Amino acid sequence: MKVNVNPAKGMRDFLPAEKEIRDYVENVIVSTYKQTGFELIETPVIENIENLVGSDGGENLKLIFKILKRGEKLDDFLSMTENDLADLGLRYDLTVPLSRFYCNNKAKLPSVFKALQVGNVFRAERAQKGRYRSFKQCDIDIIGDKSSVAEIELITTTSKALAALNVDKFSIRINDRRILKGVILFCGFSDEEFDNVCIIVDKLDKIGMSGIEQELIAKEYKEDNVKKLIEALNEINKTGTKCLSEYGVEAEVIENIDYIINSVKELSEGKYKIKFDFTLVRGMGYYTGTIFEIEYEGLGYSIGGGGRYDKMIGKFIGEDIPAVGFSIGFERLVNQLIEENFKVPNLQKIVLLFDNENKYVDVLNKANELRAKGYTVSVYEKAKKLGKQLSQFEGYGYMGYAVYESENTEIKEFNK
């Protein structure tokens, strides 16, 4: 019987050259975050199902990979509902596990904890190009700080990580869920209508203002409310945060977002932009305040985002703890870098080739000599078709090669 050797749908294998880039990007991000004082932690990929389904993860709650209970008899299974069958699930993000981790270890952590976490998350998406069922996230979070200093630190630290990768064609979009709610309720919509109206407002870039108006009317919202909201959107687009007080947004909220924007502008030294965007929504239901995204020039999607989630930890311990996080979209970032023909800099990785007649001990001694000089060296027997062999190693990400000679082994770079 023929065996299917492809990865499961939505999963991927990585060849050496791509894995080299992925590891390099991850190392740069992690080292930048650690350099700015964030502490690396690790949480399990499996969580108790009640923690996952009770977390306000928005649409992601429908995409949880659930793990069936073990050891029950068939008759017991037949009498259970879907939720009864599963007691565990694979994490769909790193924020929910972090919240549980913090509650479990609160006594051992500082009052303001700066967490760094990197790991794979899992979502039962419909498999299609660009959508994976397993993908890596790189998160930094600040727990225990209710001030806007936390947002400023997250935004500037994430920007430093991107700069360390020579990514410079990006800007930060920022909004606040309280601004969204204030304006939408002021225009006459109800609390119950808020989430669905937000989903439509979020489509401005794709369908334009007239498209938003048509979709709101098609959903049978009151025409007066729709008219007020469109007028509000047009005015906010022109004046930014200056007109928000006219729509019932509290002065404290406006001052907070203005302070973040002005502080980041000063700290960015003009290397990237930050702008207020009322139509920025973000999908997670657990956000309570500021929300932000990284916009990459020329792409139709973000390469990272986050926000404040001051109510999530309270669901675990009955006490609200302020928290805010930022996640780099690792997969999108790596894919874009590869698209731009990114090469790992200063990669001293070579292949040392030898003939059958060479003494293998001498070849290994030469390899160790090169390694002592800082090279990463792989040793292979020279193929009859040398050109094809060298082309393969260049494709694997090697910077050069050397053919062993007892007197003079010369390293030759592929791109010279």
Where are these regions (language model features)?
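Acidic, His- and aromatic-enriched active-site or binding-groove loops in soluble protein domains
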Residues: 60-74, 188-211
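Short, basic, helix/turn surface patches
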Residues: 65-77, 199, 401-416
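Short acidic, glycine/serine/threonine-rich loops at helix termini
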Residues: 53-57, 127-133, 183-187, 287-288
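N-terminal targeting/leader regions
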Residues: 2-15, 194-243
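TRNA-binding/sensing appendages of the translation machinery
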Residues: 1-92, 96, 152, 156, ...
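Positively charged, Gly/Ser-enriched RNA/tRNA-binding surfaces
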Residues: 21-36, 47-48, 82-85, 93-107, ...
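Short, conserved phosphate-binding/catalytic loop or strand-edge motifs used
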Residues: 132-138, 174-182
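Short, surface-exposed recognition loops or helix-turn segments adjacent to catalytic cores
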Residues: 169-178, 197, 275-281
